[in-house]
Amino acid sequence: MKNIIVICFFVLIQSGILVQAQTNTTTDIYQQGQDGYACFRIPAIVQSKAGTLLAFAEARKKSCSDTGNIDLVVKRSEDGGKTWSHAITVWDDGDNVCGNPSPIVDQETGRIILICCWNLGEDHEKQIIDKTSKDSRRVYVLYSDNDGKSWSTPKEITSS
């Protein structure tokens, strides 16, 4: 029995089945205070048809609050997440909220579709839910046909 275990061990070594332990590494894609933003929240990540990682986030300009000037940004990685591009602005609507990024990749065409929300920057969540806000929360769609390097103009689809 002892000989069988020793033989199996050497067979495994020779076949390459025994591998060294993998070292896990982490990378902070978005950091507080980076690129002129106070805070980044609500991340979403997808892999494009070309293999590029796209990390979306809400970029909160003045604070980590859910109201005020919130932009949608994306960072790209073409090396499996080892390095990341600077933030690319997907949608900036001044002092309003552009948020809740929900990316989808069309595996046939390669188009990256981004569903997101918009509301007035001065409207608070409770007001929106209670229907006492100045405006409502709306749903928009944007897309990229060049692997997330640039984005279409947002199109409202709330009633669709």
Provide a role label for each language-model segment.
Residues 6-16:
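Bacterial N-terminal signal peptides
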